[in-house]
């Protein structure tokens, strides 16, 4: 495994309602497969839209950099019956992994209730350790060339997080990664639209998850 070809783990943003969590649980990539045909920001707000086609992060990572997803026969790597692709021992370093933390909070696969950020961060820790183990199996001591072997000590991944997903990732890095065997597993964190200083809108909603984003506490 050579940088920058580390596994990419996508952590999606906030889904407030039960219906939104169900919709998220129904999407294999939780929005990471959504593209665009226009620039969504411009210096001049009155300027006409500019056409620019971006296929989606998932498609671009596959077509330009050789990444692939880890779903096999309708299962995810966190499912008990997941099996690697034929001829493989685990997953490649160039893998796109989606952290499906809202599955348990949907009515489709769980109790329909959201959980605290700390709970989601612990789940992210578990997922990263699972990815580490599978990459080590695929590109470990028997890797070709041997010098490219991946071990638990040198394993790294990228975290790409949107909105509240950035808060989950930060909690993992700051509180869990150093003490749960993750070492320096997160090589880089990319956050998109994360309310690092809280969100004024959180004061509008009287739900536990919104309280974690308030700016006055």
Task: List the predicted regions and their residue ranges.
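Helical cap/lid subdomain of alpha/beta-hydrolase-fold lipid enzymes
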Residues: 5, 10, 16-57, 62-63, ...
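Long, low-complexity, polar/charged, intrinsically disordered or flexibly structured peripheral segments
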Residues: 73-89, 98, 137-140
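Short amphipathic alpha-helix adjacent to the substrate-entry channel of hydrolases
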Residues: 52-70, 78-87
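Structural recognition of the beta-strand scaffold that forms the well-ordered cores
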Residues: 7-11, 95-100, 158-159, 188-191
């Amino acid at each position: 495994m050579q940088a920058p070809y580390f596994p990419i783990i996508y952590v999606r943003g906030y889904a407030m309602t039960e219906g939104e969590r169900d919709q998220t649980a129904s999407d294999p990539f939780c929005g990471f497969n959504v593209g665009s045909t226009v620039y969504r920001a411009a210096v001049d707000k009155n300027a006409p839209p500019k056409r620019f086609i971006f296929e989606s992060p998932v498609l671009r990572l596959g077509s330009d950099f050789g990444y692939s997803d880890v779903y096999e026969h309708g299962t995810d790597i966190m499912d008990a019956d997941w099996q690697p692709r034929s001829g493989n021992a685990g997953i490649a370093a160039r893998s796109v992994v989606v952290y499906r933390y809202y599955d348990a909070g949907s009515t489709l696969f769980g109790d329909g209730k959201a959980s605290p950020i700390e709970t989601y961060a612990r789940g992210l820790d578990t997922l990263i350790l699972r990815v580490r183990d599978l990459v080590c199996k695929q590109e470990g001591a028997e890797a070709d060339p041997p010098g490219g072997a991946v071990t638990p000590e040198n394993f790294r991944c990228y975290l790409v997080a949107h909105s509240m997903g950035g808060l989950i990732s930060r909690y993992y890095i700051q509180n869990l990664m150093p003490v749960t065997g993750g070492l320096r597993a997160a090589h880089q964190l990319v956050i998109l639209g994360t309310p690092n200083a809280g969100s004024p809108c959180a004061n509008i909603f009287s739900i536990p998850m919104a309280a974690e984003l308030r700016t006055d506490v």
